[in-house]
Amino acid sequence: MIINSNIKITLEERSNKLEQSHIEIGLLIGQESEISEQQTFVLGLFPTPLNISNTDDDNNNKPINIDSISSIDKEWILEYCHQVNIMLYGGIDIVGIYMIIPDSDTLNEKNNESFIMKLLKSIHTIINSKSLQFISYSKKTGLINGKATNSTQLYRLKSTEIKVINNLENEFLSLHCILPIDIKLKSKNGMISFENLKKDIIEIFENQLFKESTLLIENEFVSGNEIISQQFKSKSKLNIDLLINQLDSISTSSLEFNFNNNNNTHCIAYIHQLEQIKTAFKFIKKDIIKSVESRFDLLFNEISSNNNNNDNDQDNIKLSKESPILELPRRVNIQWLSNKISICDYLSSNGTIDDCYKIINDLLQITSPKINSIESSKNNNNNNNNNNNNNNNNNNNNSKLSNKKENNEIKENKDTQSNLTKSTSQQQTKQTNNSYLIIIISVLVLMVAFYFKFFV
């Protein structure tokens, strides 16, 4: 097990805030190596929020502290796994759990290890990993102990070596893929089965979209067996293009309802620098499917709560034919480890950025989170396009008015010049006529003078 140096620091800080008898449990976040089956990278951790006591008076509801391992609410932990799993990009997964305990002997108490094994087995069904890691931190000694388990071991915990690396996140590359998809589905009588819908989507992606696609990294077609850091040296961010035959839409049948997926879906995955390129493709494909699934999960919950569906019909969502276009939640990119690795959240059509801040603070206990980017909605894009079109029209109209004005000015100038030319020509003609008249008079005067001199 290779862990980030920040994990030990975080465990020490959180241990100092706990009372001596209390226990803290949380999730380990990282990546399993595809090359080495025995190697797992643990990048960070998320403490599980304390459950709240249910009382009639909301003001008296208080967090329930964990006094023993057996008092841990397993269902609460599993629900937390579901929530966190949605917020992780491709390649980043829940790789295990950690506990801050009073003393290392706590694990040896009766039934405690058995409880942890059962908890890890339940988590394994959610994240579907090859193995799971378990880290315990003793408040008494300040030491970290590492164990691992998997299904072949029947989830029995076995000790494992822990290697600490400073800034482990710097050994990871980010993969980015922009995928434009509008999902079109037909419903019978305005009802859609939620589970069938998800199955259809996964089948469409895996059997149609991905099978007939070609993946390029940095506009290059590369062998899947190459080590990614050797092929792309000195790069920490790589762009992936997914070339498919049909990119505009995914359709199961003739259209009745449109699920607007914001035109461009920004998919992200992270991969350790020593992994193979085929693993990078696997992680980015996983993020594409996971992103669409998560959006439908959230949309289903929103529609169900609005429609007040009966308990007997929880799997179906009722759609209104008056609103054939449903906007899927938008993805929000949130900074997590420095500026290297991010997590995500989703904003519903009625959600605000304040909702996102609250979820991050309450669920992940990240104070003052930094949001890197938010997917723009299609409506906003349309509005922007309309504004651009209006601006273009205004510019065209202004251009036409300007041209018309210029033409009028040119015409006026031409008329003026024509008048000036005409006036000048008239003046010149008048002057010429006057000259001719003077010459004729002068000749007549000379002829009269000559006559009187010689004949009279």
Curated annotation (Swiss-Prot):
One Gene Ontology cellular component annotation held by this UniProt entry: membrane
Stored Pfam families: ODR4-like
Record field: transmembrane: 436-456
Any one Gene Ontology BP term: protein localization
Main location: membrane
Domain of life where this protein originates: Eukaryota
Record keyword Methyltransferase present: no
Biased composition (Low complexity): 374-401
Keywords for the protein's UniProt record, in alphabetical order: Membrane, Transmembrane, Transmembrane helix
UniProt keyword S-adenosyl-L-methionine, yes or no: no
Membrane topology: Single-pass membrane protein
PANTHER family reported for this sequence: PROTEIN ODR-4 HOMOLOG (PTHR33966:SF1)
UniProt family annotation: Belongs to the ODR-4 family.
Function field: May play a role in the trafficking of a subset of G-protein coupled receptors.
Protein's name according to its UniProt entry: Protein odr-4 homolog
Organism of provenance: Dictyostelium discoideum (Social amoeba)
